């Protein structure tokens, strides 16, 4: 069985002091949870202080974005080399980046290559819009996004997060069977794109209104290897509960 990954995406939430308080409030409980990969993705400004708090911890850090150049006249951007000193993971291609900042499949591809070059592990997000879901275009959209994102890459493993846009922040998660079906298809596309071995080793996460009440059902599905958690990751009790339930499932196998 692939190792379960639980990643908390804080998005544009928490001040510096709030971020440090939140991490300190759940650090001890999270460190007691074994067998899964636990990742926190705070805003950029909180990465360094949280890194200090989590020194020698089993809890990993991730960024929410990066730019694809190492340095230069790119005002307001963060480079892979800067992040490499602070964290292990980086979220790339989140639907909010695509919607609000116009990120294309080509840009996502450049960012993945830049992250890998710097030794960062990308968490690549894909997912369909509400109207695409209603029109039966989910598979077509996922295939296009994946092929654009992975163009020119020869990888033995990549982390993918399936986040149907209609489920993000709405409180309306995809049903476990819907998520399982879509993620099964993503694995097929990975097989076609990167080869069967990569498809079998690559963790595929579900994201979209994940909480402590639905995580066990989600992770009990055969194709789902973890979760990218939004709002629930901003509540210490909820995030710890999600990680604890994930570890129970992991340790059964």
Curated annotation (Swiss-Prot):
Reactions accelerated catalytically: D-glyceraldehyde 3-phosphate = dihydroxyacetone phosphate
Disulfide bonds: none
Domain of life from the UniProt record: Bacteria
One Pfam family this sequence matches: TIM
This enzyme's EC code(s): 5.3.1.1
Gene Ontology annotations of biological process type: gluconeogenesis; glyceraldehyde-3-phosphate biosynthetic process; glycerol catabolic process; glycolytic process
Positions of the catalytic residues: 94 (electrophile), 163 (proton acceptor)
Residues the entry annotates as binding substrate: 9-11, 169, 209, 230-231
Pathways per UniProt: Carbohydrate biosynthesis; gluconeogenesis; Carbohydrate degradation; glycolysis; D-glyceraldehyde 3-phosphate from glycerone phosphate: step 1/1
Localization (cell): Cytoplasm
Protein keywords: Cytoplasm, Gluconeogenesis, Glycolysis, Isomerase
GO molecular function terms attached to this record: triose-phosphate isomerase activity
GO cellular component: cytosol
UniProt cross-references to HAMAP family, sorted A to Z: TIM_B (MF_00147_B)
Protein family per UniProt: Belongs to the triosephosphate isomerase family.
Subunit structure: Homodimer.
Its biological purpose: Involved in the gluconeogenesis. Catalyzes stereospecifically the conversion of dihydroxyacetone phosphate (DHAP) to D-glyceraldehyde-3-phosphate (G3P).
Name the record gives this protein: Triosephosphate isomerase
Native source species: Dehalococcoides mccartyi (strain CBDB1)
């Amino acid at each position: 069985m692939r190792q379960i990954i639980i990643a908390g995406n804080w998005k544009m939430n928490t001040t510096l002091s709030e971020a440090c308080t939140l991490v300190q409030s759940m650090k001890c409980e999270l460190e007691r949870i074994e067998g899964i990969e636990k990742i926190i993705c705070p805003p950029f400004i909180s990465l360094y202080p949280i890194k200090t708090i989590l020194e020698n911890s089993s809890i990993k850090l991730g960024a929410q974005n990066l730019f694809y150049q190492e340095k230069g006249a790119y005002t307001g951007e963060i480079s892979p080399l800067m992040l490499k000193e602070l964290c292990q993971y980086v979220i790339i291609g989140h639907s909010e980046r695509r919607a609000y900042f116009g990120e294309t499949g080509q840009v996502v591809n450049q960012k993945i290559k830049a992250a890998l070059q710097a030794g960062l592990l990308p968490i690549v997000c894909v997912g369909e819009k509400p109207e695409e879901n209603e029109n039966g275009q989910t598979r077509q959209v996922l295939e296009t996004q994946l092929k654009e994102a992975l163009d020119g890459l020869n990888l033995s493993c990549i982390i993918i997060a399936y986040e149907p846009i209609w489920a993000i922040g709405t409180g309306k998660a995809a049903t476990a069977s819907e998520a399982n079906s879509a993620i099964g298809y993503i694995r097929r596309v990975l097989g076609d794109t990167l080869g069967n071995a990569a498809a079998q080793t690559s963790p595929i996460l579900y994201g979209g209104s994940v909480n402590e009440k639905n995580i066990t059902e989600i992770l009990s599905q055969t194709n789902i290897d973890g979760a990218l958690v939004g709002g629930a990751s901003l509540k210490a009790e909820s995030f710890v509960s999600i990680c604890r339930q994930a570890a129970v499932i992991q340790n059964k196998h």
